[in-house]
């Protein structure tokens, strides 16, 4: 079911003059012929409806679809659908003007100049405009015959120097950047080959003016080839209606030229001589045009060859520049890589130097800490120093560094010289002056001094060979309460660790308490 918006009540003409006008218009355009045939067939086949009681004089009509008059892809209300209506009455109104074209669809533009007696109207499609022109041209309106023509397209441009690969769609796409394009056509010859020319029709004049200025000032390229298009205003020709006899002005020149009918000039006459000269002039013009066209064609071919060679040279130059740029970039990348390697080496060296400095700092700090601890805690030899001292003193037996022979641990018997000093090694020691001693106990296998004689003889006298006579012993000393058992003896001169040195071991006061025979000395 068709929409009512696409339907239109159209009047069927019974006038033979109108039918002849439709036939003449149908001979000019196939769409118009189809529309006229549809109107005629519909008028013949449609049953005559009953006349309306309210309007008995209303002419008969039928309903048609307006969309059937549109070509596939055709745009509506374009400049090509615009009609010029001349010889209008001066008192015509806009409503009367619209009512004149209401049977051909809804118009979109209506303009009337009553002073000069003309107007413009734009219909929906080109086919409807052609039908309206064919029907209304010459119609008497208020005793004045109407003159209807297609209006000149003021927004149309001619495009030259087109490439053979340019199509209608590409041409429309290229010029759409200046404004809405209604139609773009590439002109071809009878074989369908592009002639290098075309035309573009815009919807309004400002975009056409903009395209004309931009293409004239710059070089507008449509394809890869640097071949700019030439844009010019389109020359308007009326090749449909031409100049009918009824529009000719009957001047004196008109009547003079129309005195003789069309004829062929007879050879040898005045007419034939000058007619031949006119033909020779036209032939010369034709030859010159052909020569000019030939020169232009050769110049174009030469320019295309030079352009192709220059394009190859330009491409080679671009390739060389790109190669040089890549080489420069590679060299720069290599330099950056070398700089990065140098930086990494420097950073590694700095890290190694920092690590070494930190280790030295740690070692120095450790030594300072050790020295500080030794200074704070006094002379306390560590384990390694004790071991070194023990190795230096030598193993003197299973009892320790000092293995003093006494009554409870007698030394092995033997005659090995005088008894050594208690706790003293005989190496690097000076001799003790005094009377020679008898045979004493032998040295132990460890080389330590073993005193074989008991510290207290049988008579109870205490020998003072080891300790010189000192002040009275302090209280608490184990030797302090032996009254009457000890007789004072003279101290042995020269007894000491070194010959001629002080008595005793030379450490501290000799008058100190001695708590036991095997007590080790303090450090």
From Swiss-Prot:
Transmembrane segments: none
InterPro entries: NOPS (IPR012975), Nucleotide-bd_a/b_plait_sf (IPR012677), PSP1_RRM1 (IPR034522), RBD_domain_sf (IPR035979), RRM_dom (IPR000504)
Location of region: Sufficient for paraspeckles localization: 124-357
Record PTM Phosphoserine, positions in chain: 409, 473, 477, 509
Region of interest (Disordered), ranges: 460-523
Claim: Acetylation is one of the keywords in the record: yes
Outcome, altering residue 197 to A: Abolishes RNA-binding activity but not AR-mediated transcription coactivation
Compositional bias ranges of the Polar residues kind: 472-490
Residue positions where Omega-N-methylarginine is found in the record: 507
Chain positions covered by the region annotation Sufficient for perinucleolar caps localization and interaction with NONO: 230-357
Positions in coiled-coil regions: 282-376
Alphabetized CDD domains for the sequence: NOPS_PSPC1 (cd12949), RRM1_PSP1 (cd12586)
Keyword Coiled coil: yes
Keywords on record: Acetylation, Activator, Biological rhythms, Coiled coil, Cytoplasm, Immunity, Innate immunity, Methylation, Nucleus, Phosphoprotein, Repeat, Repressor, RNA-binding, Transcription, Transcription regulation
Assembly: Forms heterodimers with NONO; this involves formation of a coiled coil domain by helices from both proteins. Found in a RNP complex with CAT2 transcribed nuclear RNA (CTN-RNA). Interaction with NONO is required for its targeting to paraspeckles and perinucleolar caps. Interacts with SFPQ. Part of the HDP-RNP complex composed of at least HEXIM1, PRKDC, XRCC5, XRCC6, paraspeckle proteins (SFPQ, NONO, PSPC1, RBM14, and MATR3) and NEAT1 RNA. Interacts with ALKBH5 (when acetylated); interaction with acetylated ALKBH5 facilitates recognition of N(6)-methyladenosine (m6A) RNAs.
Record's function text: RNA-binding protein required for the formation of nuclear paraspeckles. Binds to poly(A), poly(G) and poly(U) RNA homopolymers. Regulates, cooperatively with NONO and SFPQ, androgen receptor-mediated gene transcription activity in Sertoli cell line. Regulates the circadian clock by repressing the transcriptional activator activity of the CLOCK-BMAL1 heterodimer.
Recorded family membership: Belongs to the PSPC family.
Protein's recorded name: Paraspeckle component 1
Source organism of the structure: Mus musculus
Lineage: Eukaryota, Metazoa, Chordata, Craniata, Vertebrata
Encoding gene per record: Pspc1
